[in-house]
A protein has these predicted regions:
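Extended catalytic cores of very large enzyme megasubunits
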Residues: 1-498
Length: 498
């Protein structure tokens, strides 16, 4: 496509003015790319220019290592210990067909920031030189081959990804075809049991999952509250805050495969006696020893709490050691057990429900944390909880996944996203047939992830193989409305999105 609004001399002049004596050609390339990118705010076509310049730099970097075809890229990856045997076994006997299928022209679909992110974080790099050993199209074809059983399936998936019709999640993009194929996005861990051994075991599980690019959701509702008696030592517990401080440091220390920061969200039910201190963990003032700036926080709220808020009634806080059954109850069962515990005088403290709710809202407004998630609604609406004994104890890092967890099963979700804006006929109408084909292909790929996956911990393998959950989302709905000239809140837009 012609970039008719771009002034090449303007980019060249600015680039030259930023040079210094002794600058290398690599520095010249990088300066020209960033110069073009900085002009994107004035004219979007400069972003396309920056992307094309960067694509040229990537191609030159790969070719400089004597890698001129997809099969050579996979071979080099295998030689340096990055690509696995299964990928090589598919690629080697089908090298000509796969090499011929690669379409460099599809790089045009990238804008600058997308391609820059791909270059900085996703493309495989030589472990010693740190140079990329694959181009963007070789990257897509590697993933497609790793996720497919045969060449036709690989080529079909490659075209969908290269055209940006559909993309799997980041862990799938990071790790497909590598020696550690951890391809799942989300891991939901039930609360550690109320023991030193269980808490430290949970730290280890979280570190292993984060190491291989997993996002973490974990409950801490079962852990006893501050002041609770420890029978073995006749001492008193410091509550959940010191444990979460340790988890905070661990999440910061163990990043996601060197690609991005570790990330975790901790869920707590509002009857836990440490809930007020929990809501202070992300505050910017106060004792730093009781602050966790790397953890995200979420409230796991039963309907009974909201009913007490509406009625301006009292709310009782309990030590989980005294009422361990609360965590595995929801709906009417929880409400009856809660009322009985109140009547028996087991509460550690009683406060006004609205005061606690106001503190939740203040935390949410000031820090963006303390997300409101509703325990009873989640459990009632789930097909998993129809089986006796199954309970949803939390959501995930991004709060879009709801699955049952237990001490023996870690919930997993395998994610992908369809780009709705890429599903149009040439005449400008939305292509529902193409969407159906993309959905069918995506679901098969996501299901295959479950079988191919490397599981850092056994409880994740057990949960994923038992339930086989997939999460297929979509993006680009606003772009669809824009292309069709539909008001976002209009009846036609509502009908199309439904």
């Amino acid at each position: 496509d012609g970039l008719y609004a771009v002034d090449p001399m303007r980019v060249a002049t600015r680039t030259i003015s930023g040079l210094y004596d002794g600058a290398t050609t690599a520095e010249l390339d990088e300066l020209s790319i960033r110069t073009a990118a900085l002009l994107t705010g004035e004219e979007p076509e400069y972003g396309k220019l920056a992307a094309r310049l960067l694509a040229g730099v990537i191609a030159k970097e790969v070719a400089g290592q004597e890698i001129h075809a997809f099969s050579q890229s996979v071979q080099r990856g295998h030689e340096v210990g990055l690509a696995n045997d299964r990928l090589l076994a598919l690629v080697q006997p089908n090298a000509r067909k796969l090499n011929d299928a690669l379409d460099v022209a599809l790089d045009r679909h990238f804008d600058y920031f997308g391609l820059r992110t791909l270059y900085d974080r996703y493309l495989l790099r030589h472990p010693r030189t740190r140079k990329v050993i694959e181009t963007p199209q070789q990257f897509f074809l590697r993933i497609a081959c790793a996720l497919s059983e045969d060449v036709p399936g690989a080529l079909a998936l490659y075209r969908r990804m290269a055209e940006l019709d559909y993309l799997p999640s980041s862990p799938t993009l990071f790790n497909s075809g590598t020696t550690h194929e951890q391809l799942s996005s989300c891991f939901l861990l039930d609360s550690p049991q109320d023991s030193l051994e269980s808490i430290y075991s949970k730290y280890g599980d979280i570190a292993q999952l984060s190491k291989f690019s997993g996002g973490i959701g974990v409950s801490f509702t079962r852990v006893r509250s501050r002041g609770s008696l420890i029978k073995s030592t006749n001492g008193h517990s410091n509550g959940i805050v010191p444990w979460l401080k340790t988890l905070d440091s661990s999440v910061a220390a163990v990043n996601q495969g060197g690609k991005r920061k570790g990330a975790a969200c901790v869920y707590l039910e509002p009857w836990h006696a440490d809930v007020e201190e929990f809501l202070e963990l992300r505050d910017n003032t106060g004792d730093e020893a009781r602050r966790t700036h790397n953890l995200n926080l979420a409230n796991w709220i039963p309907d009974l709490f909201m009913q007490r808020v509406e009625a301006d009634a009292d709310w009782s806080l309990f030590d989980p050691r005294v009422v361990p059954e609360f965590t595995d109850l929801f709906g009417g069962d929880f409400e009856r057990a809660y009322a009985q515990a109140e009547a028996q005088g087991k509460a550690v403290k009683t406060i006004k429900a609205r005061e606690l709710y106001a503190r939740m809202m203040r935390t949410l407004a000031q820090t963006g944390n303390g997300w409101m998630t509703f325990k009873d609604t989640c459990n009632r609406a789930s097909n998993q909880t129809l089986r006796p004994g199954n309970v949803i104890h939390l959501s995930n890092l991004c709060t879009e996944i709801l699955e049952v967890t237990s001490n023996d099963e870690t919930a997993v979700c395998n994610l992908g996203s369809i780009n709705l804006a890429r599903h149009f006929h040439d005449d400008g109408l939305f292509d529902f047939d193409k969407l159906a084909e993309t959905v069918r292909l995506a679901v098969r790929q996501l299901d295959r992830v479950i079988d191919l996956n490397f599981y850092p911990i056994e409880t994740a393998r057990r949960g994923n193989l038992r339930w086989r959950p997939v999460g297929l989302g979509c993006m680009g709905l606003q772009d669809v409305f824009f292309k069709l000239r539909l008001p976002f809140d209009g009846d036609e837009a509502r009908a199309l999105s439904a």
